[in-house]
């Protein structure tokens, strides 16, 4: 069996790699605006392959980190329900990759609607799992030493998710991308903190 530390290190590398790709998509001439456009819009066009690779790398990182947490990093052991929810996130992301989104100026299609449904599922699963895991991890060493960070990230994730939903309305749609990006960055930083804690536990 691969150790939790090894899984965590590989997971950290993958998540950091994803954030690198995420940053690159905002630097490359994609024609997408970081405030107005959804992140999934990067999948449509010449940079779609880069976006999909980032989606795969991010999912692998999440899976590795989750598998590490399954190895009961502390006492009491973590509940299995939020970990199972995290395992379902990559499944939802597969749906997002298979069914590309519709761009703002295009008519909504069945494919685009399915993409949005899978995206909603991925976001909801991610938030629910983080919401349930944060208080438990905060009571387990070594995460207890930076429990304030985990709780702060959890609050940022909640606020960004709420604002993300609010800005889905037509009047506020022009700033939807900003809060979607805040949600994605804050959740990935949360996973990085968790993975770093796993590595620190074995140090």
What does each model-identified segment do?
Residues 2-31, 36, 43-202:
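Hydrophobic, aromatic-enriched alpha-helical segments typical of multi-pass transmembrane helices
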